[in-house]
Amino acid sequence: MPRPVLSVTAFCHRLGKRESKRSFMGNSSNSWVLPREEAQGWMGQAVQGGTRTSRSHASFPKLELGLGHRPSPTREPPTCSICLERLREPISLDCGHDFCIRCFSTHRIPGCELPCCPECRKICKQRKGLRSLGERMKLLPQRPLPPALQETCAVRAERLLLVRINASGGLILRMGAINRCLKHPLARDTPVCLLAVLGEQHSGKSFLLDHLLSGLPSLESGDSGRPRAEGSLPGIRWGANGLTRGIWMWSHPFLLGKEGKKVAVFLVDTGDVMSPELSKETRVKLCALTMMLSSYQILNTSQELKDTDLGYLEMFVHVAEVMGKHYGMVPIQHLDLLVRDSSHHNKSGQGHVGDILQKLSGKYPKVQELLLGKRARCYLLPAPERQWVNKDQASPRGNTEDDFSHHFRAYILDVLSTAPQHAKSRCQGYWSEGRAVARGDRRLLTGQQLAQEIKNLSGWMGKTGPSFNSPDEMAAQLHDLRKVEAAKKEFEEYVRQQDIATKRIFSALRVLPDTMRNLLSTQKDAILARHGVALLCKEREQTLEALEAELQAEAKAFMDSYTMRFCGHLAAVGGAVGAGLMGLAGGVVGAGMAAAALAAEAGMVAAGAAVGATGAAVVGGGVGAGLAATVGCMEKEEDERVQGGDREPLLQEE
């Protein structure tokens, strides 16, 4: 009995099914081979002499498709069959459909004991069918990262030196490191909170920074935020280093806060800015830079607040107020007084603040005003065998180290939880003198904006000028700086007005270069006299001389351009007049030739001369009228061009 004939369509269908099964099992060959059972059973039809005879083939030749290597298509992440978004807390049913656990609970048929698939309506026989995809993914073998990538991740986050103190006591601001931190992709366009730890050396700052740094990643990921055990985060540790001269910052920001209101939190170590070995000028400048690089300060002291701590705090608050007034920023947003190993273990933080205020007795007025307000709070951290006391309430006595660790971690969690509320911000209602009004969230400074403000501050500090040894002298220099900038802007505005007023040709011709030079000189002297009286620094004469030199240079640049423009306008008018005179001479010569021709033809030389004279007079009058009309049209076109808004400034900024 002959075998049934296998058509080409059936052959391709059966071949595709077999090959799909083999491909699923991992066969990556580019050539397809017909199975042996089909190769032997395949019957071909041969026509011989008008009759068909069946002829079987013992073997089927290998079919080469020559597909070559094809790139595997990109696999999209699994999506929920209900919300069509990426799976969140996914579950998988026996039917093969995946859902978010929240979507599945919402669309589950009420009253159905067994789970029913919302897509295919298939009822699962066992509740074991709800298997979490996340748990199954955890069972997959984890591939280690390449060594190069591991090294990159290890060095990506580190503490960077922002402000260095050289051997002579001078400050070196490293703008490259500042830009690397504040212009990080997570902080460039995001409000920033700079959590700065102040204090003397060997006062436990590294211990505090380590716990803050270990708690930030867990809080960022949504965990409880408690510091993890030591060693659980390799590479994320502040560490103790004897070379702490200067200001340091952790290079990687941590995004904290609610969704849509994230704040990039940085950790800052002020190093030895409180060292008495530094000069007064260096300490004042470090206080100014610390104010710019912090929005949440923690003054870490040992045992109790000493007179040196209060003196430094007084200077810091004074400098912060001066900087805040000049740059339009909030001077002190939040300050914690953390007293470690306190001997006043039976008092609360508020009681300790009262003792401090009584001790001050008007010696440090700015510190007293700060402690009386709501911007500062005090925490007493006793030794591990003593109890913990905060500002609001006192805890029961405890003599175990576990109690100390518990309360210390509670303080760390409280600091990290409230840090997003103290992002770097400008003063409410204004930024600073001469700047636009800020409202709402625009008061919060992003990383890029703060980096620009620090660059402006470094430009002022880097100028060779008189030194200052106190916040008052610094305030006087900043006041004089504002006055100098105001004088420059006033003179620039006057020059711009003169530029606009002399745009037209005939308006410029009415003001000679010497006259314009006298006008600029008079205005310069008036500005110097008016703003020079308001200067406060002792080096008033040097400041006025430098300002006069800058104004004189700007006036000279304008006069050079104005003189060239005046000469160009004068040459244009002279060219028009010269063209008119040439036309007049040509008219006279032409009239004379016409008169001579008429005289020769008519034989009346006298009449020809008279005609020539008359023609000359007529032509001359026509040329004069034409010249006047031309000049009038030029002036009219100039008026229309100026009134139409075509006012190109003479001075352009690159």
Swiss-Prot record:
UniProt note: phenotype after gene disruption: Embryos exhibit blood vascular defects and die in utero. The survivors manifest growth retardation as indicated by smaller size and a reduced weight, and display impairment of brain functions including motor balance, and spatial learning and memory. Mice exhibit a reduction in the size of brains, reduced dendritic spine density, impaired synaptic transmission and reduced levels of antioxidant enzymes in the hippocampus. Knockdown of RNF112 diminishes neuronal differentiation, glial differentiation and dendritic arborization in primary cerebellar granule cells.
Stretches that traverse the bilayer: 570-590, 603-623
Gene3D superfamilies from the UniProt entry: P-loop containing nucleotide triphosphate hydrolases, Zinc/RING finger domain, C3HC4 (zinc finger)
EC number: 2.3.2.27
Subcellular location(s) of the protein: Membrane; Cytoplasm; Nucleus; Nucleus, Nuclear body
Outcome when changing residue 97 to N: Loss of endosomal localization
Amino-acid positions noted as binding GTP in the UniProt annotation, renumbered to this chain: 340-341
SMART domains: RING (SM00184)
Assigned keywords, A-Z: Cell projection, Cytoplasm, Cytoplasmic vesicle, Endosome, GTP-binding, Membrane, Metal-binding, Neurogenesis, Nucleotide-binding, Nucleus, Synapse, Transferase, Transmembrane, Transmembrane helix, Ubl conjugation, Ubl conjugation pathway, Zinc, Zinc-finger
Predominant cellular place of this UniProt entry's protein: membrane
GO CC, alphabetical: cell body; cytoplasm; endosome; membrane; neuron projection; nuclear body; nucleoplasm; nucleus
Chain positions of all zinc fingers (RING-type): 80-121
Keyword Oxidoreductase attached: no
PROSITE patterns: G_GB1_RHD3, ZF_RING_2
Known catalytic reactions: S-ubiquitinyl-[E2 ubiquitin-conjugating enzyme]-L-cysteine + [acceptor protein]-L-lysine = [E2 ubiquitin-conjugating enzyme]-L-cysteine + N(6)-ubiquitinyl-[acceptor protein]-L-lysine
Record's function text: E3 ubiquitin-protein ligase that plays an important role in neuronal differentiation, including neurogenesis and gliogenesis, during brain development. During embryonic development initiates neuronal differentiation by inducing cell cycle arrest at the G0/G1 phase through up-regulation of cell-cycle regulatory proteins. Plays a role not only in the fetal period during the development of the nervous system, but also in the adult brain, where it is involved in the maintenance of neural functions and protection of the nervous tissue cells from oxidative stress-induced damage.
Family designation: Belongs to the TRAFAC class dynamin-like GTPase superfamily. GB1/RHD3 GTPase family. GB1 subfamily.
Quaternary structure and partners: Self-associates. Interacts with SP1 in an oxidative stress-regulated manner. Interacts with SIGMAR1 in an oxidative stress-regulated manner. Interacts with ZBTB16 (via C2H2-type zinc finger domains 1 and 2).
The protein's name in its UniProt record: RING finger protein 112
Source organism per UniProt: Mus musculus
Lineage: Eukaryota, Metazoa, Chordata, Craniata, Vertebrata
Gene label: Rnf112
